[in-house]
Amino acid sequence: MAEDVRVRVGRRLRRLRVQHGWTQVQMADRLGLDRSYLADVERGKRNISIVNLEVIAKGFGLSLSRLLSKV
């Protein structure tokens, strides 16, 4: 069975966060999102809205399509 999209998105977000040298707390502060929410998203435990994906993409200096292109 194909890997859950939530897991793939979470892995992508974690990889970007680590590449930027950010902790989950730093990422949450920079993006204005809750740390525990982001932690759950990174683990593939929560769905993420398109609005929050756009916030995250902008926070990393990416377009939404670029953010999701490696998912």
Where are the predicted features?
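A detector for short, charged/polar N-terminal pre-domain segments
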Residues: 1-8
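Short amphipathic helical patch at the helix-1/turn junction of helix-turn-helix
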Residues: 7, 18-19, 47
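Short basic helix-loop element that most often maps to the first helix and adjoining turn
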Residues: 11-30, 55, 60
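Conserved hydrophobic/aromatic packing and binding residues within compact polymer-binding modules
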Residues: 13, 27-28, 38-41, 67
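Recognition helix of helix-turn-helix/homeodomain-like DNA-binding domains
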Residues: 32-46
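Short, basic-rich loop-to-helix N-cap that marks the start of a DNA-contacting helix
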Residues: 45-58, 64
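Short C-terminal boundary/hinge segments that cap the last helix of small helical domains
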Residues: 61-71
